[in-house]
Amino acid sequence: MSSPNWLKDLTGAWLFYTVFPKLTRINPRFERIARFSPLIGVLIGVLQVSVLILLLQLQWPNESMPFIAIALGLWITGGIHVDGLMDTADGIAAGPSRCIEAMKDSRIGASGIIALTINLLLQIAALFKLRLLILFAIPIASFWGRYSQIWAISHYPYLNKEGSSKFLHKKNWRGFLIESIPSYAFLSFLIFILINIDISIISTPNLIIGIIVGFLPALIIPHLLARRLGGHSGDSYGASVVLVETCMLIIFSIILPAS
């Protein structure tokens, strides 16, 4: 019996957004994988956190956790979003007339390296501040980072009609609300769980506020990028993911008390 399309899309999202192989006999479909990217983001975050917990049990120092978390994220995703950040930074620096050309160039420019360096330093600083609370912050930041793609795809024109992310864009798009259903279902479930359990190392109300506030950078950052670029491309989708993740880690480091 053929698998439902949503399960095929979920399998496709797993393959596209991570370096992992197909784990089931389900044939992947890629037409509507973007709707599942926030859930894949949560899964990536959970994998990162699981490794961190294991290393903590093996007496690894807390100070090493931010570096390991970032390294794991880069490995699991194959650096696909970070590559988009660097290309987008190079495109913005090149100016409107050469923006697309610079983003397509496989060579990394100075602006791309600077953007990557600043982003990594900010993430490391936020993770050091969060300490053990990174176990909660990383999956949520990963969720909202990828949710920004759904907003960007739905609300802004696609710059490169021949790009590799064309299938993520308008052709198979069902509208912002429809494509957001998996994300809203997950958020509702998560908030319900948090309301009904007691977490000793964290303020549950503050955590819920942080989760809800994530909607703002997930909308604002794609909007700012679209204004500078005139729309979005696969690269700027990746840049949105990385920048929103960083913004969320900073927000959590401010509103969550030190562990």
From Swiss-Prot:
Broad class of enzyme this protein falls into: transferase
The molecular function GO annotations come to: adenosylcobinamide-GDP ribazoletransferase activity; cobalamin 5'-phosphate synthase activity
Q: Which residues form a coiled coil?
A: none
Q: Where in the cell is it found?
A: Cell inner membrane
> What reactions does this protein catalyze?
alpha-ribazole + adenosylcob(III)inamide-GDP = adenosylcob(III)alamin + GMP + H(+); alpha-ribazole 5'-phosphate + adenosylcob(III)inamide-GDP = adenosylcob(III)alamin 5'-phosphate + GMP + H(+)
Which cofactors go with this protein? Mg(2+)
GO BP, sorted A to Z: cobalamin biosynthetic process
Q: Which GO terms describe its cellular component?
A: plasma membrane
What is the membrane topology noted in the UniProt record heading this document?
Multi-pass membrane protein
Q: Which Pfam families match?
A: CobS (PF02654)
Pathway this chain belongs to: Cofactor biosynthesis; adenosylcobalamin biosynthesis; adenosylcobalamin from cob(II)yrinate a,c-diamide: step 7/7
Q: Which UniProt keywords apply?
A: Cell inner membrane, Cell membrane, Cobalamin biosynthesis, Magnesium, Membrane, Transferase, Transmembrane, Transmembrane helix
Protein name (record)? Adenosylcobinamide-GDP ribazoletransferase
Species of origin: Prochlorococcus marinus (strain SARG / CCMP1375 / SS120)
